[in-house]
Amino acid sequence: MMESAVDSERTMLKREIADLRAALNQKEQCLRELEDSVSFATRSEQEVVGNDLESPGGAVHTKLTNDDIARYSRQLILPDFGVQGQLKLKNSSVLIVGMGGLGCPAAQYLAAAGCGHLGLVDYDEVERSNFHRQILHSEDRCGMSKAESARIALNELNPHCEIHCHSRMLYPHNAMHIIRGYDVVLDCTDNVPTRYLLSDACVMLNKPLVSGSALKMDGQLTVYNYGNGPCYRCIFPVPPPPEAVTNCGDGGVLGAVTGTIGAMQALEAIKVIVGMGDVLAGRLLIFDGSSCVFRNIRIRSKRPNCHMCSAQPLITELINYEMFCGMHATDKNNPTLLFSTDERLSVEEYHRKIQAKPHLLIDVRPTAEFEICQLPEAVNVPLVEILDDSYLKRLGKQLEDKELPVVLLCRRGNDSQIAVQHLRNRFPKHFVRDLIGGLHAWTSNIDPNFPIY
């Protein structure tokens, strides 16, 4: 009896500690944003010059060096490019937002081509799951800022390219300062709020925006705010519902697909800078990696009543894009919170109280993910089968036992809550719980040898 009381108190304390840590993290993030806001608000334009938030400047180059001629000779002999094109590139500055699967190849080709100045924006750090597609990062730079890691690789590729690192997130209060002095901006991000932020800022500052995306085996590419072409809001005046948005962390992506789109973003940026070719404005390039087919379709022209780029815009300053879109401006794990911690199970509780007893453990990840790794007693029932009730054919008899605990898990503890919500509606008298933090928490707190992805 005493042991049971101690276990109960221990569990309660752990929950309180977890809740306090979450609250502390949230407050610290709010504090950082407030400090950034105050810092930027109190600086004048002149004070910003020279620090990491200022875009590059410097003398205008009027001739090529012997090293330039040797290094760029194969593109110098292109009739539409030539010496003048190389000089334009050498005097240009490009801001790449997101040093991931798109940003890495884009930066690599821009640096190799002789772009004079590159700005690299990324708040994140290098981790092993990046390596298959984020080709500028390496094993020995795990934990390093992605912007700094990319700078090291790009300097080795072309020491004549000046690199400015912005190892921070873009917010409405700092975006204009960072973007202002660059000639072209590349959107290599993986989230909707940042796409709106970049588009709005580029319209206000009259900067072309080369926008790419890649997911699974597909990719898309277009150029916004160029010539008479539309902005992002012209095409998407209303953001999609959060549940309709999938990033590569959840949906997966093949590295060669991000490489294809990222390289083409570099190509479009070069065309914009040099003034050559037919820039992909007012058109959308769609790449189907499964069949290796490229399609080029026309998209709508400027929207006369666009809230941002019309003659009489309704939006005249950057807004709260997370609130506007109803989702976080990051592709990091943003936990779903459908239930309080009292209505869920920690992995420690499950391991200590339930795992050794009769129960039904349902893993709701897609089959492809279940095959990567699984707990020995888990039954794979993908979330889609939970939601359409097709799981009843497989598990109906087991679920007739109201005394049998039902535990659901997924990779991070998000989809499992959706499954719990559905099962509780159908089986209101059953004990149905999900594991907080999913398999990632299992690795962190129970079995460090269990693989994570």
Swiss-Prot record:
ATP binds at G101, D122, S129, N130, F131, H132, R133, K146, D190, N191. SMART domains: RHOD (SM00450). The modification Phosphothreonine is found at T62. It is an enzyme of class 2 (transferase). Its EC number is 2.7.7.80, 2.8.1.11. CDD domains: RHOD_ThiF (cd01526), ThiF_MoeB_HesA_family (cd00757). The keyword ATP-binding applies. One of its GO terms (biological process) is protein urmylation. It catalyses: [molybdopterin-synthase sulfur-carrier protein]-C-terminal Gly-Gly + ATP + H(+) = [molybdopterin-synthase sulfur-carrier protein]-C-terminal Gly-Gly-AMP + diphosphate; [molybdopterin-synthase sulfur-carrier protein]-C-terminal Gly-Gly-AMP + S-sulfanyl-L-cysteinyl-[cysteine desulfurase] + AH2 = [molybdopterin-synthase sulfur-carrier protein]-C-terminal-Gly-aminoethanethioate + L-cysteinyl-[cysteine desulfurase] + A + AMP + 2 H(+). One of its GO terms (cellular component) is cytosol. GO terms for molecular function: ATP binding; metal ion binding; molybdopterin-synthase adenylyltransferase activity; molybdopterin-synthase sulfurtransferase activity; thiosulfate-cyanide sulfurtransferase activity; URM1 activating enzyme activity. Binds 1 zinc ion per subunit. Residues 355-451 form the Rhodanese domain. NCBIfam families: PRK05690.1. In the N-terminal section; belongs to the HesA/MoeB/ThiF family. UBA4 subfamily. This is Adenylyltransferase and sulfurtransferase MOCS3. It comes from Drosophila sechellia.
